[in-house]
Amino acid sequence: VIASDNCKIMFIDCIRLNTMCQKTCENHKKIIYNLLGVVSEKNIALNEKIEFLSKRTTREKLLSYLYSCALKSGSRTFTIPFDRQELADFLCVERSAMSAVISRLREENIIKSDKNRFTIVGG
């Protein structure tokens, strides 16, 4: 795990967390609810990443990711949370190969891109 910002790690005693306290306090319920939400979001993100990485080519991985971002944003134009190197790392591809694919997709008028802002034009 690599953090992009400074962070703190919190270790949670799962046994204590799974055992409700005597009073069944609201704070305990809220912690469990919030933790379940975080775990659920992480599970969804990991399943999406598996979907991207299961593609065979850099082009397929990239297009799968970009279409997913467009769907999530509800728009053909969207901004991704990565620079080119971070995106290449996320998709487990070489940055130079990915940049070449982006250039070809632009030439084929499938996407428009400016840094981390993309528009799905066709496809």
Predicted regions and their residues:
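Mid-sequence acidic-hydrophobic segments that form the walls
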Residues: M20, V38, K42-A45, Y65, ...
